[in-house]
UniProtKB/Swiss-Prot annotation:
Pathway: Cell wall biogenesis; peptidoglycan biosynthesis. It comes from Chlorobaculum tepidum (strain ATCC 49652 / DSM 12025 / NBRC 103806 / TLS). Pfam families: Asp_Glu_race (PF01177). This is Glutamate racemase. Keywords: Cell shape, Cell wall biogenesis/degradation, Isomerase, Peptidoglycan synthesis. InterPro entries: Asp/Glu/hydantoin_racemase (IPR015942), Asp/Glu_race (IPR001920), Asp/Glu_racemase_AS_2 (IPR033134), Glu_race (IPR004391).
């Protein structure tokens, strides 16, 4: 049983290490515009992907505890690193509240989309090092070939707002050269920061490679889960997200405006 009573009006809690989870917020808002969203970006401790597993699991517990104070009906882990290394910690801390991780949703979508059976995955050092994407993809279909590549500089570039910048293009060209000759037809953006850089990534990979953004898959999964439990918010009003960060709220506002293309309500600064 959940730790608290939930209703259709209860919020969806979403967390990530920084601004990357806004890609999930955007997808959930598009799919489920009436839902109230509580978002936490751990901007004081970003990036998670270069931390140890012990530290990542500690952060995952603390982030979930923060969201649980808002009595959510669903928690979305908008961080592939946590999805890969600490989803069990989130589930334990959530105490019966359903949890959706971006990693499994992205893996399932990649399996659906590939025609050649050759899938590339880019992610943080921790996510790629965990082998979680390869395992999740082969769990769906064991004959598929998976080519992983760690891209550790993408998160800091996104956090700096270098969305369409020559430095980002140079780094992306270096990383994506790893797929030359691999004949992949599908590329998983295995970090929620990476869709922020999607325009540059797509310009390098070309139109013949299908880009998998797990944010859209997660939003679809969230809608299905809430509908099955009778917890969809039926309000005709569009809800604005409640945004929390652990550092630099003004910078977060600027990046939110840049990425989401809209003004936003106040950003709450919380201590961790």
């Amino acid at each position: 049983m959940p730790q608290h009573k939930v209703s259709s009006d209860s919020p969806i809690g979403i967390f990530d290490s920084g601004i990357g989870g806004l890609t999930v917020v955007k997808a959930v808002q598009a799919a489920l515009p009436s839902e109230r969203i509580i978002y936490f970006g751990d901007t004081a401790r970003v990036p998670y992907g270069s931390k140890s597993q012990v530290t990542i699991r500690k952060y995952a517990r603390e982030d979930t505890e923060l969201l649980m104070k808002h009595q959510p009906k669903l928690i979305i882990v908008a961080c592939n690193t946590v999805s890969a290394l600490a989803l069990d910690v989130v589930e334990q801390t959530a105490g019966g509240i359903p949890v959706i991780g971006v990693l499994k949703a992205g893996a399932e979508l990649a399996v659906q989309k590939t025609k050649s059976g050759r899938i590339g995955v880019i992610g943080t050092q921790a996510t790629i090092g965990s082998n979680a994407y390869t395992c999740a993809i082969r769990e769906e279909k064991e004959t598929l070939e998976v080519f992983p590549k760690a891209c550790p500089l993408f998160v800091p570039l996104a956090e700096e707002g270098f969305i369409d910048h020559p430095a980002t293009r140079l780094v992306a060209e270096e990383y994506l050269a790893a797929f030359t000759g691999k004949e992949i037809d599908t590329l998983v953006l295995g970090c929620t920061h990476y869709p922020i850089l999607r325009k540059i990534i797509e310009s390098i990979t070309g139109p013949e490679i299908t880009i998998i953004d797990s944010a859209e898959a997660v939003a679809s999964k969230a809608g299905e889960l809430l509908a099955a439990r009778g917890l969809l918010n039926q309000s005709p009003e569009k809800a604005l997200p409640h945004l929390m960060v652990s550092d630099l709220p003004q910078k977060f506002r600027e990046l939110y405006r840049l990425f989401m293309g809209t003004e936003l309500p106040d950003v709450e600064l919380v201590g961790m």
